[in-house]
Amino acid sequence: MTIEKRIDIYVFICMKEFPLISVVTVSYNAIATIEQTILSVINQKYSAIEYIIIDGGSTDGTVDIIKKYEDKISYWVSERDNGIYDAMNKGIRHATGKIVGIINSDDWYEMDAFATVADLYLKKGDLYLYHGDIRYCLGKQETRVDSPNLNLSDFYKGSCVFHPTVFVPLAVYRKVGVFDTAYKIAGDYDFLLRCYLNSIKFMYINRIIANMRI
């Protein structure tokens, strides 16, 4: 067997064992925070990452920061959009990974988030939506909030899954659709409810996945 053939087999095994995770960041005039977001993605303890940034036409220097890391970014664009959910949908349309995470430009991931999600995905597959705990950050004050397993009554009480912690198999988007752009602030809640009503199971991860500034 040639060296080239052995390398091809090794690459195939790696791709099979480590599913590609697509990550979408949407941004607009986020110069103060987006660099931390980007670093939390590209410095993950996991290498099979496709990183997509959809910027809404920032004018404050955000694009300069994106360009600083564009060798680590699979796709990015800066153009006007029709709101946050339109931007998220643009990112999803460019995603080719098995799983998609969405993180806004003022939030950031824990360094082991992707490895944790990928490990569960390999065990559970495409019929689950993966989510975990979040850390709220207000200045120096930090609060961990959990998001345990859900039932339908939880949805009627309001949003009960923290969107920055959510990872959705691309197959789920194909089944239930993407975000409804008719919503201005509740599109993520609508999407999660559609998942639940379409028998997508929610897999809770008992650890902090992401951090959110409040």
Residues of each region from the PLM?
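Nucleotide-sugar donor-binding/catalytic module of glycosyltransferases
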Residues: 4, 8-214
